[in-house]
Amino acid sequence: MIEVLLVTICLAVFPYPGSSIILESGNVDDYEVVYPQKLTALPKGAVQPKYEDAMQYEFKVNGEPVVLHLEKNKGLFSEDYSETHYSPDGREITTYPSVEDHCYYHGRIQNDADSTASISACDGLKGYFKLQGETYLIEPLELSDSEAHAVFKYENVEKEDEAPKMCGVTQNWESDESIKKASQLYLTPEQQRFPQRYIELAIVVDHGMYTKYSSNFKKIRKRVHQMVNNINEMYRPLNIAITLSLLDVWSEKDLITMQAVAPTTARLFGDWRETVLLKQKDHDHAQLLTDINFTGNTIGWAYMGGMCNAKNSVGIVKDHSSNVFMVAVTMTHEIGHNLGMEHDDKDKCKCEACIMSAVISDKPSKLFSDCSKDYYQTFLTNSKPQCIINAPLRTDTVSTPVSGNEFLEAGEECDCGSPSNPCCDAATCKLRPGAQCADGLCCDQCRFKKKRTICRRARGDNPDDRCTGQSADCPRNS
């Protein structure tokens, strides 16, 4: 039997329309101050770990209460995850820190089928969530009241400079005829069910970035972990699991000659990866995080279709923003090039601001366009990259079912947690006899609402969202 433990903090919200604040993510216009309320479901008699496998938080956004359901990203680190830095005399110092009880989560908003979330819960809640089609960021406020957080839209983060930020890859659509043709193909839903693939990622931090963060290894580690958690979430729709295998920080000096021309630095980094890094530890792909200013406002570069090649399975990314999410999007973009994805063409790809846009947009870029999916499918078919087929060593990337965590896991039909729920049997996580559903905007008294019942009122010019009569979810109408 499951007992639900409610840990109530304090729920409040204070909007600050038109005001500005300096946060870790940068200067922010228009934000709300919220005090999240934590709701935790634990088995009776269970010892609460420092960071639970599943958590729930309630707070308000634009005056409306939302419930954020989080589940620990157990596939974030490989089983043999390692960290390397260097002594003053150049010796490698490698450790294998315990990462079992880490603080990085993925999740969703209750009753919003299209929602996603990528959150660090290390010191308060920090990350992003998608709610009703809008991307919001959340992070703790440095106030005497430690529970205060700021919630704000992505586009309300002020630009750190006005110069456009570009990917340095300049190959065009005509550069590969097979890929060009792939962009014109129609993929059936069956074809778009991508096979499960795994990328064991190595991240290398250059000396300039190490110095930028005051030679604070812990601060860099935290930033990188947040970044990879975000990248992992963005690749989930493609059925790609990104696992951090190693973090190598050039704490004493750069181990290659850093150049302002991005492709030159990428070539040197690829040579170093092939001759040095791969001999230290096996991995599938390496990214170099740097503080160098590349020519042409370039913030990233990667080899096209280089995944699994010893020299070319690399990318380089400038740490161009204090906002971790923005740098994570750039790294996601460069990994996409290594997976065969070209830049989105504005005339051929129907996506206003997708991940593979050549220029960073003011609007959130956390989705792959249909063109990108076609490119990736073609890369899998033509190049058959072998290194990303095998799963990492970790065997517990699928969590043990935890009743009451609001995630439908293996073997569960419903997930309520409370024995008093009339629709769901908390002991078995199965629907009770006669019940069609237990939760959702189109579920009422354990039954699906009638077809055409309004489940979400229109916003702007969009039509009302209506139930299908066959599901508890409220689908978004176009």
Swiss-Prot record:
Disulfide cross-links: C308-C387, C349-C371, C351-C354, C414-C429, C416-C424, C423-C446, C437-C443, C442-C467, C455-C474
Catalyzed chemical reaction(s): Cleavage of 3-Asn-|-Gln-4, 10-His-|-Leu-11 and 14-Ala-|-Leu-15 in the insulin B chain, and the bond Z-Gly-Pro-|-Leu-Gly-Pro in a small molecule substrate of microbial collagenase
Tissue spec: Expressed by the venom gland.
CDD domains: ZnMc_adamalysin_II_like (cd04269)
Keyword Calcium: yes
One biological process term in Gene Ontology: proteolysis
Co-factor binding comment: Binds 1 zinc ion per subunit.
PANTHER family linked to this entry: ADAM A DISINTEGRIN AND METALLOPROTEASE DOMAIN, DISINTEGRIN AND METALLOPROTEINASE DOMAIN-CONTAINING PROTEIN 28
Note: The disintegrin belongs to the medium disintegrin subfamily.
Name of this chain's protein: Zinc metalloproteinase/disintegrin
